[in-house]
UniProtKB/Swiss-Prot annotation:
SUPFAM superfamilies: P-loop containing nucleoside triphosphate hydrolases
Gene that this sequence comes from: rpt-6
Family: Belongs to the AAA ATPase family.
Residues annotated as signal peptide: none
Protein's recorded name: 26S proteasome regulatory subunit 8
Length: 416
């Protein structure tokens, strides 16, 4: 009888290989499963870390608010302070302060305040119990007054002002020269001019020249209209004038331009009504600020009006207004210069005679000459052209100067 076959020899040789593949497949599945779990756990950790950082930021913000509220609560628990005005410094640790309406006191200065920063007229806070000076306060300025300060300097230059060479020279001497070179006046031993009055018919370039001065002097420019200083309640206009000069002193050197000054600077007459009395109070405060007890060395005032005949003589006297500059209607040469300035950027046809156009507008102001250029461009636009001709200027002259110029126009041009 034959012996039984061996088990190793009778088994299928492919079975160990299949088992090995199964084990590898299971290992890959487990590796992929745990890798996914690890990625999910890392994502959760990242989210939690982000939440922790967000909560820490919120905690810091809340701690800041709590600290500010504690400081505010502590200030509310403290006694109130008196507001005073520094008269003068007595020594390194004491100053003379005027408290309204009680009087003047010599007070101690807190260690945290520099004695050199306490200038005459500065607003300060005094402790209610010891009258010690513990805080330097900013000057009180009405928001309406602070808005009068021109933040952006106008882009007008002297080259944009035509036919006013004499006026430009005079205003440079009075306004620009003292601001840029005050040492020249000190060397000569003469007082600097304080103010200048620009007067003349409407549209002759008074405001334009003031804008050019603001551009070239490179100092603080404050623009105010006279009608803005006429207020409803008693004393409001005078207070605004006072705060206007306070703000000008803070930002010195500065220039104050008062347009339409005749609205508050008219001559005083007897038997005026209540409204006129308030206007007169405003003018009296202006007179005091121009030539009062306090010096205004670094403040220059430019006033403009077209009614110099109704201004008060007290406003026009030397010491307040040191120079009066007249702006007459431009002559023929000045009108030609103004036409060249305003037509500089226009697309003109060749051969346009500006001198001939200037001859056709006798007595025109600078504003009317500028209007001629604008109307000439409108006539060209009406005919769908991108260039301006001599005929456009002649028709613009007829329209601006209100002449009967229909005979010079064709029916086609009138109704096209």
């Amino acid at each position: 009888m034959a012996p039984p076959a061996s088990t190793a020899s009778s088994a299928d040789p492919s079975k160990p290989t299949a088992q090995k593949l199964t084990e590898e497949s299971d290992e890959k599945t487990l590796r992929k499963y745990f890798s996914t779990k690890v990625d999910d756990a890392q994502q959760k950790v990242a989210d939690k870390s982000q939440n922790v950082r967000r909560l820490q930021a919120q905690r810091n913000e809340l701690n800041t608010k709590v600290r500010m509220l504690k400081e505010e609560l502590q200030q509310l628990h403290e006694q109130g302070s008196y507001v005073g005005e520094v008269s003068k410094a007595m020594d390194k640790k004491k100053v003379l302060v005027k408290v309204h309406p009680e009087g003047k006191y010599v007070v101690d200065v807190d260690k945290s305040i520099d004695i050199n920063s306490l200038n005459t007229g500065a607003r300060v806070a005094l402790r209610a119990d010891s009258y010690a000076l513990h805080k330097l306060l900013p000057n009180k300025v009405d928001p309406l007054v602070s808005l009068m300060m021109v933040e952006k300097v106008p882009d007008s230059t002297y080259e944009m002002v035509g036919g006013l060479d004499k006026q430009i020279k005079e205003i440079k001497e009075v306004i620009e020269l003292p601001v840029k070179h005050p040492e020249l006046f000190d060397a000569l031993g003469i007082a600097q001019p304080k103010g200048v009055l620009l007067f003349g018919p409407p549209g002759t370039g008074k405001t334009l020249l003031a804008r050019a001065v603001a551009h070239h002097t490179e100092c603080t420019f404050i623009r105010v209209s006279g009608s803005e200083l006429v207020q409803k309640f008693i004393g409001e206009g005078a207070r605004m004038v006072r705060e206007l000069f306070v703000m000008a002193r803070e930002h010195a050197p500065s220039i104050i331009f008062m347009d339409e000054i005749d609205s508050i600077g008219s001559s005083r007459v007897e038997g005026s009504s209540g409204g006129d009395s308030e206007v007169q109070r405003t003018m009296l405060e202006l007179l005091n600020q121009l030539d009062g007890f306090e010096a205004t060395k670094n403040i220059k005032v430019i006033m403009a009006t077209n009614r110099i005949d109704i201004l008060d003589p007290a406003l026009l006297r030397p010491g307040r207004i040191d120079r009066k500059i007249e702006f007459p209607a431009p002559d023929e040469k000045a009108r030609a210069d103004i036409l060249k300035i305003h037509s500089r950027k226009m697309n003109l046809m060749r051969g346009i005679n500006m001198a001939k156009i200037a001859e056709q507008i006798p007595g025109a102001s600078g504003a009317e000459v500028k209007s001629v250029c604008t109307e000439a461009g409108m006539f060209a636009l009406r005919e769908r052209r991108i260039h301006v001709t001599q005929e456009d200027f002649e028709m613009a002259v007829g329209k601006v100067m209100q002449k009967d110029s229909e005979k010079n126009m064709s029916i086609k041009k009138l109704w096209k």
